[in-house]
């Protein structure tokens, strides 16, 4: 197996659970918060910095600074960079290094964009009906339905802002991913099965390409 699965998701859609079950079933590594640990270790920066900046929205001016620095190489100027730049670039590099270790599941953090030129990547987006999301978050955090909905709206907005600034795509839009699935329709296990089927089709295509 060569496929690297990246998963973006609406808050409360069970995307993280789906990713973890998928990785366990396939016997491959799973990266969610684990990615922050890897980025901190590789960069020498404190892990708390990554947690504090994790998928937080930024502004377009900072984005341009970050991408200019990445384009021209940042090894010699890393110490001169604003903290946000250091965190973003370290995380970006960690994703690329992780992809070199073999097949895995990476949740969030613009991983699909970081690896968009990798032919082995299958990018997934998980959504769910709002009522199911409210029910899940309300139960998980012992919140009223109203507070759960507010939390969902806030975090979705943060994820969209982060993704839209750091990529050339739009968060949650079908054109941004290889496959979009509704976990309310398929359920958690059914969504995992759908992704497995997609991986099988992609793997067959990869084998065909290399056999020509």
PLM feature spans:
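Pre-Walker A (Motif I) flank of P-loop NTPase domains
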Residues: 1-10, 102
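Glycine-rich phosphate-binding P-loop
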Residues: 7-20
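ATP-dependent small-molecule kinase phosphotransfer cores
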Residues: 40-103
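Small-molecule kinase domains that catalyze NTP-dependent phosphoryl transfer to phosphate-bearing small molecules
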Residues: 55, 59-66, 70, 144-188
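NTP-dependent small-molecule kinase module
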Residues: 92-96, 165-212
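RNA pseudouridine synthases
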Residues: 98, 111-117
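Conserved phosphate-donor/acceptor-positioning beta-strand/loop module used by diverse small-molecule
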Residues: 117-139, 145-153
